[in-house]
Amino acid sequence: MQLEDGTSAGLRKPSPPLLCRFYDRAVGAFLVDVIATRPLSRTDTRSLVYVAALGAAAVYFLIFPIWRGQFLVEIWPTESWNAYWQDAVSRGLPLYPDPTSLVGNNYPPLSFYGVALFGKLFAMGNLQAGRALSIVALVLLAIEITGIVKILAGSTFYGALGGLWYLAIMARNSTIYVGADDPQLAGLAIMGAGLWWFLDRVAAERDPTPALLLMVVAGFWKHNNIAIPLTCISWLLITRNRFAVRGVMISGAAALAGLGLCITIYGPNFLPNMLATRSYGMGTLLANIGHLQWIALALFIWLFWALSSRRTAAARFTMLHVGFGLFACLLQWLGHGVSGNAEFDLILAAAIGIGAAFAGASDTLLSHRVGPDRLRDIMVAALLLRLLASDRQETALLFLSDDFRASLRGTETNLRFEASKVAIMPGNVECKTKLICRQAGKPFVVDEFKVEEMLLTGKATPQSIAEKMAAAGITTFNETLPATAQPKASLIYWLKNRH
């Protein structure tokens, strides 16, 4: 029996719940009327609102790290550490020191040359060049996410949403790396380009070996971005790709050849530096794991879609990628001194997963109940709320608080003043804030991280370290003024104390 709406009598669709009907009339009508200057469909208008909302969040959170980059302050200790080695490349000095010294370099070489070249091309100092390059890399990663989701899920638009969320969450939650002189983001951008190229070639049934070789290059820029190559190699083997053995063999040989070339160029110091002394334990993992709360919601949204679409290639690939990203993150957090950059692989995988989840929202069980439009509205709203739900609001304070703006200017003044005192000290000097010694023109003579790890692992004692410093004529500078970029970013504190 046919009803007036064309459905069968026994298959009448249930009436939407009262909340859903209210939602359609209230929120749905609002979305359709947001842009009244031109006749847009409901879908077009929703799409524009999604882009506007996530795009505004990305711009909002990027304002602070971009503004902060102008100041001569140490954003994070690795900033000055990287700048010192970039200076070494610029001046033709050794890049990998004597393993028995008090300094070490456990990063592969390409980033130091890349940043030094970038600075030379754009007439910037190495510190500023590294900061600028990290912002460029972040934007490139967002573009790569868009292209990757287009291949996996067939939607450039929803890929762009994943990219915008990635910009926002990184600028929001990784401020010691975004806009800082650190090679992690640029290395990940090279790796992300390799992933995009890999998927494009696999989709076209072409040999993905060139893309795997690009990933090898990325590994010599920054060596701990391992989730993407593990995912791609596993995918080739799982899908029994006819180029799998060739790709694995050639890329593996290229990686070994690269290591051999580095040993030839940098001599016997290279491997001992790369295999730096480090302590390991569950304590570091437990101290860091709470940081995953920031992407937990995104991972939940992705997982809900992936389980509903688990038979699709997109879901299976992202399951591999997220799984390896989580594995890489937890593994690295076992090492003492490892920070938020260990989760960058996982955040990138989550962003790709979010884009695919938006594209495939109509395939989920919840979509069958509330409709794909409402489901996507909920997803966008939830992601935005998680981004904003924090007392730490640097960008807001940048506009609201004179004291907040003045704090970094004051910190730069402190650093320059401290550097002027170090500059007149005779001989080699150790600075807790390495940028002070660098600004004073002093060489890099004590790596506090290496010294700390030597002490933790029992490879040195405080007495042996003191003896080495005395033998090298190293004096410790006692800082009296704050010289690191640690402005008070609590919005609640500002509200309570503004009068």
Predicted ranges, named:
Residues 35-36, 41-42, 228-253, 276-281, ...:
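Perimembrane helix-loop-helix junctions
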Residues 129-154, 161, 168, 193:
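Transmembrane-helix motifs of polytopic, lipid-linked glycan transferases
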Residues 192, 207-223, 229-236, 253-258, ...:
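Membrane-interface alpha helices of multi-pass inner-membrane proteins
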Residues 47-54, 252-253, 361-394:
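Signature aromatic-anchored transmembrane alpha helix within multi-pass, membrane-resident enzymes
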Residues 153, 186, 191-210, 303-313, ...:
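Membrane-interface transmembrane helices that cradle and orient dolichyl/undecaprenyl
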Residues 382-499:
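Extracytoplasmic
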Residues 80-103, 110-113, 117:
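Extracytosolic helix-loop segments that constitute the early lumenal/periplasmic catalytic or substrate-binding loops
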Residues 135, 227, 336-374:
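Hydrophobic/aromatic-rich transmembrane helices and adjacent perimembrane loops
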